[in-house]
């Protein structure tokens, strides 16, 4: 069973979805039964835009951070849709999407400078997947 569509989730519905949840924010966002439509390729930049570390516990997020996260989800998914979707997906006519790894802000950019602060983007392990973070823009504590 899929959760609600991530794109366009309302400013009331999103906090309600997170209320009382345990676990880390990245794991929650990747679970399609919680929120449908966010793949691992998008998650790095969504969390970066919201300035949230992927290992942050959901219960520690402030209302302001939750709203920033909701806005980052909308912005990142809308940007991909405007470009025809992700490069690894095809449309009904077999045409691949135009949103490529080169369009990502920090995703898959380990060792490169952060586009906001210049710190080095790091690759960290988050459960069964890896995640790219800026240690300055997305502090864990």
Over which residues does each language-model region extend?
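Residues immediately within or flanking Cys/His clusters that coordinate Zn2+
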Residues: 32, 110-111, 131
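Basic, amphipathic alpha-helical segments enriched in Lys/Arg and hydrophobic/aromatic residues
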Residues: 65-82
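Short Cys/His-rich Zn2+-coordinating modules
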Residues: 92-104, 115-119
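Short functional micro-motifs and their immediate structural scaffolds
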Residues: 121-122, 139
